[in-house]
């Protein structure tokens, strides 16, 4: 055997995964998929099946996340990248900050632990997702999302057609359902609150667009997924859901415009057509009444607030609460509903509703601006890397996934609402995984 052949053999041997590490990686991927499905089904268990233990079920995903973190670090599946090092360092600093809040403000340790969980537990899970998922795993989660969209669309349609008092519109704790207009509910699907369903709609639309740009994905799945997504979008009664649809649609058509019309890409172009026809056609043909109701709600809301100003204020208001928060904040986790429940026995949102100012109020100027700065920088980096993927390989999947997760990283209530937290960090990890595995698309 020649020296060159020997070196090639050694290189090939180094490229092959260690059997034990590969087995552990597959287990972690399975845990990720289980966690994702539980994110969608958790609300149904809490409000319909097992309401007496709904508080405990809120944490039903956490053991699977803990096991995935354990396997990942035990088998060294994650590298110490700058992002991982920064996240670890910041999480340790927040532990000391929480200890300060316990001593200085007599804050309940459970509140601090809950707050730390919201800030970092699923951030580490996102880093695990980025490290272990291959492009085939990313594609599988996308397909699962489209499959789930079909029964979710049917459930949303039933909720939309049913009166607010119907069992299918039952709210956790027996509260009144949110309405679009008189007698018409804002659907929640399997989720306990409208914010969760909005995240489902936004994530499904991003997955739908990504599937349309993926060779080998069933066009029937894209078409039926588009029908389910259109139903969920039309019946959501949410301006934020339509914003997600608009952002994803604009990015999808921009991606389509820059890709070459080559014979080997005809299947991809057909997928984009199926997605567009299924989504827009379904909305206009089957849900004109829902669109009229949404237009009425938007008109009423515009008379009370300017959406553009509110969007801008959600960015700027974090810099205006420094005098109230001080350098070290008022209490890690104290501004959330779950944190206030642990601290006072009553669930109440005692601080700002918008994410940026509430994070600063909880953790202070130093740590609050640092944490939000990490989210802003990560968003910018993912956007740039996703653009590089489409320029270098015509791989649109990372950019389309960015269309959902970046708005959540920028302004989403990720440290306040459990489902938003799960969706935001899981899809951040999925986007990072798609970026990391973009080179695999050249081999397919």
Q: Over which residues does each language-model region extend?
A:
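A membrane-periplasm/extracellular boundary helix in multi-pass inner-membrane enzymes
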Residues: 4, 154, 160-164, 253-302, ...
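Loop-to-helix entry and N-terminal half of a specific, functionally important transmembrane alpha helix
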Residues: 31-38, 382-414
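Transmembrane alpha-helices of multi-pass inner-membrane enzymes
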Residues: 68, 399-444
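Membrane-interfacial entry segments at the cytosolic side of transmembrane helices
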Residues: 137-146, 217-223, 260-275, 395
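Long extracytoplasmic/lumenal interhelical loops at the membrane interface
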Residues: 292-365, 382-387
């Amino acid at each position: 055997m020649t020296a060159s052949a020997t070196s090639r053999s050694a290189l090939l041997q180094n490229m092959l995964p260690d059997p034990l590490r590969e087995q552990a990686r597959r287990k972690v991927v399975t845990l990720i998929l289980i966690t994702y499905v539980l994110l969608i089904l958790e609300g149904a268990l809490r409000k319909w099946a097992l309401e007496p233990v709904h508080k405990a079920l809120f944490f039903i995903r956490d053991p699977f996340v803990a096991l995935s973190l354990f396997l990942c670090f035990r088998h060294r599946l994650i590298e110490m990248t700058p992002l991982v090092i920064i996240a670890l360092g910041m999480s340790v600093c927040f532990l000391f900050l929480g200890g300060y809040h316990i001593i200085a403000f007599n804050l309940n340790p459970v509140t601090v632990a809950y707050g730390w969980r919201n800030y970092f537990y699923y951030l580490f899970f996102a880093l695990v997702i980025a490290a272990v998922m291959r492009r085939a795993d990313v594609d599988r989660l996308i397909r699962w999302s489209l499959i789930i969209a079909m029964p979710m669309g049917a459930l949303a349609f039933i909720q939309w057609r049913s009166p607010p008092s119907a069992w299918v519109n039952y709210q956790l704790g027996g509260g009144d359902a949110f309405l679009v207009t008189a007698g018409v509910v804002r659907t929640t699907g399997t989720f306990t609150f409208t914010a969760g369903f909005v995240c489902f709609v936004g994530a499904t639309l991003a997955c739908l667009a990504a599937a349309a740009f993926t060779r080998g994905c069933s066009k029937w799945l894209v078409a039926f997924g588009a029908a389910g997504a259109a139903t969920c979008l039309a019946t959501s009664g949410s301006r934020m859901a339509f914003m997600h649809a608009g952002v994803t649609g604009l990015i999808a058509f921009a991606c389509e415009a820059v890709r070459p019309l080559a014979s080997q890409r005809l299947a991809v172009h057909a997928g984009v057509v199926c997605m567009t026809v299924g989504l827009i056609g379904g909305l206009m043909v089957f849900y004109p009444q829902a669109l009229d109701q949404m237009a009425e709600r938007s008109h009423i809301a515009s008379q009370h607030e300017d959406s553009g100003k509110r969007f801008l204020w959600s960015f700027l208001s974090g810099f205006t609460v420094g005098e109230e928060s001080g350098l070290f904040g008022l209490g890690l986790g104290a501004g959330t509903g779950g944190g206030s429940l642990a601290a006072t026995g009553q669930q109440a949102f005692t601080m700002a509703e918008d994410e940026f100012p509430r994070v600063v109020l909880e953790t202070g100027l130093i740590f609050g601006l640092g944490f939000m700065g990490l989210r802003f920088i990560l968003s910018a980096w993912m956007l740039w890397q996703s653009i590089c993927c489409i320029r270098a390989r015509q791989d649109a999947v990372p950019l389309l996934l960015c269309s959902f997760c970046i708005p959540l990283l920028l302004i989403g209530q990720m440290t306040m609402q459990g489902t938003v937290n799960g969706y935001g960090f899981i899809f951040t990890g999925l986007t990072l995984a798609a970026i990391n595995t973009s080179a695999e698309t050249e081999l397919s």
